[in-house]
């Protein structure tokens, strides 16, 4: 279904891969991109379960916007093992203005398509999505 504000559709693979991450933990992360030709949000990269947060941040292009999902494992103060699913809106300052506008106008609707997201991070610079910042959002 097309996004009314931006005219973008969400490719079915996005929802399928997200459900696999959420229910079977098949992936550690998913990176999504907007395909300007098809005017559709598509899966760009899939992170294997053994890949870490550094692999995830390295997979984001330095000069292009992306959406992403990361399944973070952590230990609570009570020493309980937990995980949370994070939604990232990556919009580096060096990205094209048109791209930043397209990603910004599509974000909320796309996020609603992915049921089960627990936290959101918006970043324009790698320092805004450091592992310490992400961990601080688990409380």
From Swiss-Prot:
GO cellular component: actin cytoskeleton; cytoplasm
Protease is among the record's keywords: no
Domain ADF-H: residue ranges: 5-139
Keywords annotated in UniProt: Actin-binding
Domain of life: Eukaryota
UniProt-recorded Gene Ontology molecular function terms: actin filament binding
Family the entry assigns: Belongs to the actin-binding proteins ADF family.
Protein name: Actin-depolymerizing factor 1
Organism of this sequence: Zea mays
Gene: ADF1
